[in-house]
Amino acid sequence: MSAIPMEDYESIEALENVNVVYGSPVTNQSVFIQTANVPDARVRQAMLYAINREQILNELLSGHGEVIDGFLSSASPFFDETITPVPYDPEKAKSLLEEAGWDGSQTLRFYVNSGDPTFVNAASIIAAQWAAVGIKAEIQTVDFATLMSISGSEDYDVLAVQYTYAPVD
């Protein structure tokens, strides 16, 4: 079984002999920041405030999904409903970067799985949103095996990973 590419959703939904049912999200797309390379917590916080996750959800996933903070989606019995997602706030991001003395000439290496076009597109949106607040990121698309190797080596600044877990009964 495989996921249906996002670009095919509308045409499949339009088929008369198909009843589309959306289940709870079981895939989490996460961005990891290597703290050794981005040591100031204010910069890491700014990176999160600078991302408009609702825009990504709506533009790339047609609103099918959820914005969460944390590793587990609401489909997990271990999901913590008390955690409120950090809001999109580019002005707060800029303020945190200024407070941290961020060097805007620095370019972060942002590794993404080349095998997932939706995730590559999301990384492009994220990089543009970071650029709007003064954070440069160069996207490096690599195959999944290389991405996992880089993750284990910790030789990255930013890494985007997708996790899917089996739905629970």
Predicted regions and their residues:
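Structural transition elements
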Residues: E66-E99, P117-N121
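Alpha-helical secondary-structure segments
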Residues: M6-E7, A14, P25-D69, L96, ...
